[in-house]
Structure formats: structure tokens, C-alpha cells
Amino acid sequence: MRILLSNDDGIHAPGIQTLAKSLREFAEVQVVAPDRNRSGASNSLTLETPLRTFNYPNGDIAVQMGTPTDCVYLGVNALMRPMPDIVVSGINAGPNLGDDVIYSGTVAAAMEGRHLGLPALAVSLDGYQHYDTAAAVTCSILKALLREPLRTGRILNINVPDLPLDQIKGIRVTRCGSRHPSSQAIAQQDPRGNTLYWIGPPGEKLDAGPDTDFAAVDEGYVSVTALHVDLTAHAAQQVVSSWLASAEVTREW
């Protein structure tokens, strides 16, 4: 198995380094990751400036000023040859649950892999301590994929409780929950009296029902949520069509 490994916390983050070490015990791994923390970068691509890379002695590649999506794009299309069999993103420091997936660079890296035609996993730890647990879970899932490929055409978003491995209760297939909207913008002043702003913390849980990713992780289970790239709200298409007709929206602009 040839694995392209990326993240959004940066190439030196403990999550990606722990996971790379574990994956290399049974797979060929190429790390291509941002040279710094790019959390919250979502699916952004660098289009107006060229991208430079730095190669470490162990073969890891950092993309300077690159986003997670940049890294996977370059990894698949230029930097890993032969091409990878699968894209893995993580281990993220902190969860990517519910609405987090909209903003997550970790999920975006996996989404880019899927967009480029490859199976893809995004892995996050619900905390900042037991990266070895998340690495063991990821390796177990990847070995299962080797034995029996999963042909869903979807991204697997995996969230792991921040617990010792022997305290993990199992794995649940879940749906994304949701949070209340985040509404805080924290204002400060720089030494010259200019106002600057920090984006506030995420909103509190809104939908954390028993079948959600929030509930699974809170109860000590690994959450596995299948995500897809198609954002079309298929169930709403007829409603929108009927509204356009009843509202008499015409081509007479």
C-alpha cells in the first residue's frame, strides 16, 4: 500500500509524525504537508503565487505557505511517484465533528484526495494526548481496507476519543451532528491603538443525538462518518423549482 499522508497542523505536528511512524511499519508512506499550521484552511488552493517545497533528509516534503489542499494536489500530481493508492490526512490535534468539517483543513485534504480519484481518510483526535491511540485505530482501518476494499466513493471522517487504546469501546458509523453558530469576534488593540480581531471559539453542540459523531466520541467510541463531495441538496430541488414557478421568476430580467 502506497499512502500519501498530509495534515493541516503542519509537518512537525505530533499527530502526523506519530501516524507516519506507525504507517511505515506496513506501508510505503510519503509525507507532503504544510510547513506551518494551516488549521481552518478548508479547501483553499494557492492560485496567485507559485509553491515551493522543502525536502527533509527522511524524505518528508513540506510545502512552504501551502494549504492542505495544495499539499495533496501536489502530492498526487507531482511529488509521489508511483502515485499513491490512498490519501490519509491527520492525525488532527482536536476533533472534526459536526459542522467542523466545513472549515477543517484535515477533512479538506482528504476531500482533495477523493476529488482526484483516490480513497481517502481524515483522522482527528478529540484532544491532544493519545495520538498513539488514533494511530493504532487508523492502522487497523487501513489494514482492513487492504483485506477488503471499501468501494463507496466516499471520504471516511474518523474521530478518535482521547483515551488509552484499551479504553476505546469500539467503532460506530455515525452522521454529522451540528453546533450552534459561533458568534464571537474577540477584539483587541495593538500597541499603536489599531483594532484587531480573533475568531471566537466554536459554538456549543446543537444536534448531538445518539447517532451523531458527537455522541459516539463522548461515549468512548471511534466515530466513522462517510462524507461526499457532491453538495447538491437533491431533496430540495423540486421545492426550489416549484418556488421559482410560483414566484413567477422569469427570463425577463
Swiss-Prot record:
Q: What is its EC number?
A: 3.1.3.5, 3.1.3.6, 3.6.1.11
**Compartmental location:** Cytoplasm
- Keywords tagged on the record: Cytoplasm, Hydrolase, Metal-binding, Nucleotide-binding
**Cofactor(s) annotated in UniProt:** a divalent metal cation
Q: Which amino acid positions bind a divalent metal cation, per UniProt?
A: D8, D9, S39, N92
Q: Which Gene3D superfamilies match?
A: Survival protein SurE-like phosphatase/nucleotidase (3.40.1210.10)
| Enzyme class label | hydrolase
Q: What is its main location?
A: cytoplasm
What does the cofactor section's free text say about binding?
Answer: Binds 1 divalent metal cation per subunit.
The record's comment on protein family reads: Belongs to the SurE nucleotidase family.
The identity of this protein, by name, is 5'/3'-nucleotidase SurE
Organism in which the protein naturally occurs: Erwinia tasmaniensis (strain DSM 17950 / CFBP 7177 / CIP 109463 / NCPPB 4357 / Et1/99)
